[in-house]
Amino acid sequence: MNLVLMGLPGAGKGTQAAKIIEDYAIPHISTGDMFRAAIKDQTPLGQEAKSYMDKGELVPDEVTIGIVRERLAKEDCANGFLLDGFPRTVKQADALEVLLADLNKQIDHVVHIGVNPEKLVPRLTGRRICPTCGATYHVIYNPPKVEGVCDIDGSALVQREDDQEETVRRRLEVNVAQAQPLIDFYAEKGYLRNLDGDRPINEVYSDVQALLGGQ
């Protein structure tokens, strides 16, 4: 079973991915993990990706796609995979189709977890970090015992600049604009499966299970 998982930041992709890989025994493959592994293994493509990342530049599509190809060719993907964070563009999606055909594979489902962006703002702005130990909290979903204070070491919690409302809203706008052409692409291909993410985690996952069945 070969899956692509799509959704805005904060839509709950990570939570659903964790359940899918446990229940269906397929590897969770994220772009970040692929880059880190290729760099750690010092593969030629990994070293090329690192040269761009060290300069703060975006890794070109051809390098990213090469790393994806290497990862999907590994033995643990023989019975399927869950791609998360790739593809991000129609160009990447086209390239993914080609490389999967080369590997005698094809996408079974593109699972899109749809969430109202306005509902994501409090999720994404509520995160607080301990600058000392790195512990993560959320003012609504995972608050510390004492407001604004780390449970572990008593440090004052901080909000990352990335989590401030103006930045979050801007990031969501960009993500919505980038995602729509990809959603349209997979809808035309017949792969797209839209799930309502504005519900409790277990309700969303029940829909995932109904979709995937005993595959």
From Swiss-Prot:
It comes from the Bacteria. Pathway: Purine metabolism; AMP biosynthesis via salvage pathway; AMP from ADP: step 1/1. Zn(2+) binds at C130, C133, C150, D153. ATP binds at G10, A11, G12, K13, G14, T15, R127, T136, Y137, R199. Residues 30-59 are annotated as: NMP. It is found in: Cytoplasm. Monomer. Consists of three domains, a large central CORE domain and two small peripheral domains, NMPbind and LID, which undergo movements during catalysis. The LID domain closes over the site of phosphoryl transfer upon ATP binding. Assembling and dissambling the active center during each catalytic cycle provides an effective means to prevent ATP hydrolysis. Some bacteria have evolved a zinc-coordinating structure that stabilizes the LID domain. This is Adenylate kinase. It comes from Exiguobacterium sibiricum (strain DSM 17290 / CCUG 55495 / CIP 109462 / JCM 13490 / 255-15). The gene is adk.
